[in-house]
A protein has these predicted regions:
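Vicinal oxygen chelate
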Residues: 1-6, 28-77, 87-114, 125-128
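Conserved active-site tyrosine of GNAT-family acetyltransferases
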Residues: 17-22, 90, 118
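Short glycine-/small-residue motifs
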Residues: 120-123
């Protein structure tokens, strides 16, 4: 039985990635370790799910959120309280906005960003 999903990201600029995800996005630090010449930090990211999609549906999601196909095989999605405000905060902290928040057919407000460590992010807020 799986107990935890852990996404491991190799960041060329470790300090910038840590600042962005821990200090700006607000992911709490669970643990940090070092090895000769290397470091790792484990950040809490709330409840985790694994969303598996086929290529046509991934293309559909990109069309809805961005207007064109932009995601690779992996995209990280964070549910946030206010996707519009969080998009602005992350942009000010160095992320590139790929698509501004847009209302989706599944009733959420989704934004797409390129973030440190080469991750493409979706920020989403479920609408009532």
């Amino acid at each position: 039985m799986v107990r935890e999903l852990r996404l491991v990201v190799t960041a060329d600029d470790y300090d910038e990635a840590l600042r962005f995800y821990r200090d700006v996005l607000g992911l709490p630090e669970r643990a940090a370790f070092s090895s000769p010449g290397g470091r790792v930090t484990i950040l809490e990211a709330g409840r985790a799910t694994l969303e598996i999609t086929d290529p046509p549906h991934a293309e559909y999601i990109d069309e809805v959120e961005v207007g064109r196909r932009v995601a690779g095989h992996i995209r990280v999605a964070f549910e946030v309280d206010d996707s519009t405000a969080t998009t602005r905060e992350l942009e000010e902290a160095g992320a590139t906005v790929v698509a501004e928040p847009t209302k989706t057919p599944w009733n959420s407000l989704n934004a797409r960003l390129e973030a440190p460590a080469g991750l493409q992010l979706t920020l989403f807020t479920e609408l009532e």
